[in-house]
Amino acid sequence: RAGLLLNERLWAESTDTVKGRAEHTRVHTQRVEKRGNLVNLYEFTVFSDSLLLLGKCDCVEARRDDSGCRIPAVDFPVSLYPVEYKHGTLREEETYQIQLCAQAMCMEEMFHTVISEGALFFTSSHRRMTIPLSETLRTRTVTLAKELHLLRDTLSVPSAKYSAKCCRCSLQELCMPKIKMSAESYLLRLRQEAAGIIEEASE
């Protein structure tokens, strides 16, 4: 999917993408909401020189913390807590957790702070899932960031590996993940069929 989006510039709409965009409309308005010792920053831009990433957090909850860091738009020290909004109901998705971790790692680098956890908010069920930002998750995030840059640098599109997530992917018809055979294996099969090695069922 990343290869098709980044290198082939392909996109297709689906019911899920339309619903997801509609649900993000309120969140995806850059603004700051202050409520006492809590400040919510929406569409908050983050970056990392070490990860070579630039993006936006759906929401960052900045809570007053005398031992915390200083950030723009807030006049007191805070601890940071990223919240990523997702369409659908509460579920485990590694890619969502990696996205959240990348956002946290960007802010740690930007503001010289430590962020131990964040949350995924699922809009259909209105439930939060707390995500501990473990060393394992951080290592996986760094690895995928490097793979993403390599993908972009080589302008390659990896072969698709079919999984349950493909069923609801908007790019399924462009990606065709169920077609696993290469051109060579396809031609070999045709030659074998012509030679009578493979007998097709007549029923």
Question: Model-flagged regions — what are they?
Answer:
Residues 108-203:
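Metal-dependent nuclease catalytic regions and adjoining charged, substrate-binding loops involved
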Residues 94-96, 132-133:
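Short, solvent-exposed loop/turn segments at secondary-structure boundaries
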Residues 59, 103, 169:
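A residue-level signal for conserved active-site and pocket-lining positions in enzyme catalytic cores
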